[in-house]
Amino acid sequence: MLNPNIFHMPKIIIALDFCNKKSAMKLVNLLNPSIFYLKIGKEMFTILGCKFVKELHQLGFNIFLDLKFHDIPNTVFNATKAAADLGIWMLSVHASGGKEMLISAKKALKSFKKAPLLIAVTALTSFKEEALKEIGINISLTEYILKLSKLSNDCGLDGIVCPGKEAKKIKFLFGNKYKIITPGIRIAKDLLYDQNNIITPKEAKEYKIDYIVIGRSITMSKNPIKKLDLIIKSMQ
């Protein structure tokens, strides 16, 4: 299997979206930690907690703790510090939490010699434009994502989570150092599930996305390694 970390293509983060440890470890034991990153979201973290994060870290994996912190600045400061203590590689907060919250999260990492990347979530891939209007925001989804991207960049964050179609413009505006993480990656035969803003792995490469997050396409596959190989080859 080609290593996307060596070649000029998006790196792959596997979302461990399982309801139990046994199922998660069945997949983890097939993966090479020098090739793949792992994402732990709210479901797995709620079920298995900090201990599971540490176990995966000890196996040599870089962990993206995707808890999307969104609270008052002091709470986010303390939560960010606690998360960084786990030795994670990347952590997410919600960009819509505002300037003060984002700056507090960034400040929480100052004392760490090797701080995790701090990433802001702009719009979920399940998000539709009508949803903005429902909460009183009368701009397009693209404008909304760009505004939150600028806010996060101004606050010193390392990058954003955003749908793939906005990535190219964000790279142009903020440069290559500003990391883009994109979920909603599907190859042609995959089901959409509950995601609307999706792109293919090949498009992710074209848009200069740094990391792609792949969940159900892999976790629900009968042959996840074969599927991953297919995804990597599609980006060549």
Swiss-Prot record:
PROSITE patterns: OMPDECASE (PS00156)
Keyword flag RNA-binding: no
Highest taxon of source: Bacteria
SMART domains assigned to the protein according to its UniProt record, in alphabetical order: OMPdecase
GO BP terms: 'de novo' pyrimidine nucleobase biosynthetic process; 'de novo' UMP biosynthetic process
Catalysed conversion reaction: orotidine 5'-phosphate + H(+) = UMP + CO2
Pfam families (UniProt xref): OMPdecase (PF00215)
Pathway: Pyrimidine metabolism; UMP biosynthesis via de novo pathway; UMP from orotate: step 2/2
Chain positions recorded as substrate binding sites: 17, 39, 66-75, 125, 186, 195, 215-216
EC numbers: 4.1.1.23
Keyword list, A-Z: Decarboxylase, Lyase, Pyrimidine biosynthesis
Subunit structure, as described in the record: Homodimer.
Main function: Catalyzes the decarboxylation of orotidine 5'-monophosphate (OMP) to uridine 5'-monophosphate (UMP).
Similarity field: Belongs to the OMP decarboxylase family. Type 1 subfamily.
Name of the protein this chain belongs to: Orotidine 5'-phosphate decarboxylase
Organism: Buchnera aphidicola subsp. Acyrthosiphon pisum (strain APS) (Acyrthosiphon pisum symbiotic bacterium)
